[in-house]
Amino acid sequence: GGTNYIGDVGRTNFVLPNSLVGGALLKWNRSPRHAFRFSLLYAEINADDADSNDPRRASRGYSFSNTIAEASLGIEFNFWSFDLHEGHPQSTPYLYTGITYFRADHLLLSADFPNGELENQGANWDFAIPVVFGYKESITRHIVGALEVGVRYTFTDNLDGSWPEEIFGNRMPRREFGNRNTNDWYVFTGVNFTFSWGR
């Protein structure tokens, strides 16, 4: 699949994948209407003010890249009954939510920042709330394919290096930028395939 970021650098499009994401997921189908789900995903996020339609960002000229490694656990709710035991093709829209724990790099605007250069300040471990909308369909009795779009609302505003207070615990106005009242988001868009066993 693909991923994009929504925050204080670059474009603000909700779904506009610009880098790859990969991973694995495990589901436990508890009923035809819900399943427990665990996933591991790895992706790179990046953004560039030069791509923004906002003239203020375009003239500022900042850019960044970061890596996301996440584990997510939660519940997937089927809008319609989805039971592979039925013996005929199954399909349904679904919603997934739960809790995500992820690792990214802590970034900091360089002290000498005429070009908006960023310094890596180590690992940033934090939580996010995943909200995933998808549509799945049985391909065979044991294989299910799905298309989904999933947003992660994070509890950090520093995926892009805009909020150094999260690193040092105090304000650093000369190294801050963007909107301090909103946290960063990242979005995964793609397809997945699950294989059932024990039936």
Task: Please place each PLM-identified region on the residue numbering.
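Residues on the lipid-exposed face of transmembrane beta-strands in outer-membrane beta-barrel proteins
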Residues: A24-W28, L73-F77, T97-Y101, V131-E137, ...
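Gram-negative (and chloroplast) outer-membrane scaffold detector with strong preference
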Residues: H34-A111, F195-W197
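Strand-connecting loop/turn motifs
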Residues: N29-R33, Q90-T92, T140-H142
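Flexible, surface-exposed loop regions and adjacent strand-edge segments
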Residues: T12-L16, S52-S59, A111-E117, S162-R171
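Residues that define the transmembrane beta-barrel architecture of outer-membrane proteins
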Residues: L16-L20, T67-A71, S91, Q121-I129, ...
